[in-house]
Amino acid sequence: MITAEKKKKNKFLPNFEKQSIYSLRYDEMQQWLIDHGQQKFRAKQIFEWLYQKRVNTIDEMTNLSKELRQILKDHFAMTTLTTVVKQESKDGTIKFLFELQDGYTIETVLMRHEYGNSVCVTTQVGCRIGCTFCASTLGGLKRNLEAGEIVSQVLTVQKALDETNERVSQIVIMGIGEPFENYDEMMDFLRIVNDDNSLNIGARHITVSTSGIIPRIYDFAEEDIQINFAVSLHGAKDEIRSRLMPINRAYNVDKLMEAIRYYQEKTNRRVTFEYGLFGGVNDQLEHARDLAHLIKDLNCHVNLIPVNHVPERNYVKTPKDDIFKFEKELKRLGINATIRREQGSDIDAACGQLRAKERQVETR
């Protein structure tokens, strides 16, 4: 729930007349009802309408009194996302470009796997981290999303899956933006979708990825929630990582590893390192050896990413043979590594690419 204190702390939050009803955690809904002279058991009914029956309006909540429905309408908005573009890949991946109520656009991706349907959500409109391989940073950061706007991405995809009796089984927070720069809203989102009264998506089926905002890694280590944790690494040495990710100049590799070790000491959970392979930059066997040396004492997994070509950036794809050699070298050195299956390569599946294309059209 967005309070005055939250708005003061997070200057990039929107200033809507009404906040999204999807921004309230279950405990916040209970307290809000009590504060407004209602019985807190109504929270269970409201969450059932929102997340199980997935209604589009408060008026459809027919087991609530007209008085309570009116109170809810007076205070909250039912966040809706308008689908501007929907691209479907031959492998079943679907990329959505959604328009928010203030006209900004965000991306959400549905990925189909043998083990279920995974949704990749966005946490910010744009991004200010400045990764040199990512289209998301091209327009800078416009604003943060409310928790309810992040929840609505999952719900909108789930409603589409309802037509074929499928469900969202996994969530990855790897879309546009840096989740740890919108930390409180991200954490509210996690607690909402993980709640038994909501979408009930298991914590171990949710992954959050950061570019390495070190203060928030320490905060995340203290959270009582077993969410999977991934770090975008892309380079084992400062020279290469700073070239790819300018954030490394503020939070270098040594400091990042120190924070990750603290996280593991506190949680005893495995960390995934995302390592995008960029032709001629970080994809040689010497780079694999540097990576293995850096993380050899950690409980971790390396996810090797054959990077989609992004026309807005100048990096090229690493040849398949070199990708396999890189993986083989890591395994030889005792590192658990896999190559991410390419999905959506025939659509604008690189992060921020579809949004960037639409922005070009708008400004012509």
UniProtKB/Swiss-Prot annotation:
PROSITE patterns: RADICAL_SAM. GO terms for biological process: response to antibiotic; rRNA base methylation; tRNA methylation. [4Fe-4S] cluster binds at residues 127, 131, 134. It is an enzyme of class 2 (transferase). The keyword tRNA processing applies. Keywords: 4Fe-4S, Antibiotic resistance, Cytoplasm, Disulfide bond, Iron, Iron-sulfur, Metal-binding, Methyltransferase, rRNA processing, S-adenosyl-L-methionine, Transferase, tRNA processing. Disulfide bonds join 120-351. PANTHER family: 23S RRNA METHYLTRANSFERASE, RADICAL SAM CORE DOMAIN-CONTAINING PROTEIN. S-adenosyl-L-methionine binds at residues 177-178, 209, 232-234, 308. Reaction proceeds by a ping-pong mechanism involving intermediate methylation of a conserved cysteine residue. The lineage of its organism: Bacteria, Bacillati, Bacillota, Bacilli, Bacillales. Gene3D superfamilies: 1.10.150.530, Aldolase class I. Its cofactor is [4Fe-4S] cluster. Binds 1 [4Fe-4S] cluster. The cluster is coordinated with 3 cysteines and an exchangeable S-adenosyl-L-methionine. It comes from the Bacteria. The active site is at residues 107, 351. Specifically methylates position 2 of adenine 2503 in 23S rRNA and position 2 of adenine 37 in tRNAs. Confers resistance to some classes of antibiotics. It catalyses: adenosine(2503) in 23S rRNA + 2 reduced [2Fe-2S]-[ferredoxin] + 2 S-adenosyl-L-methionine = 2-methyladenosine(2503) in 23S rRNA + 5'-deoxyadenosine + L-methionine + 2 oxidized [2Fe-2S]-[ferredoxin] + S-adenosyl-L-homocysteine; adenosine(37) in tRNA + 2 reduced [2Fe-2S]-[ferredoxin] + 2 S-adenosyl-L-methionine = 2-methyladenosine(37) in tRNA + 5'-deoxyadenosine + L-methionine + 2 oxidized [2Fe-2S]-[ferredoxin] + S-adenosyl-L-homocysteine. HAMAP family: RNA_methyltr_RlmN. This is Probable dual-specificity RNA methyltransferase RlmN. Residues 113-346 form the Radical SAM core domain. It comes from Staphylococcus epidermidis (strain ATCC 35984 / DSM 28319 / BCRC 17069 / CCUG 31568 / BM 3577 / RP62A). Its EC number is 2.1.1.192. One of its GO terms (molecular function) is 4 iron, 4 sulfur cluster binding.
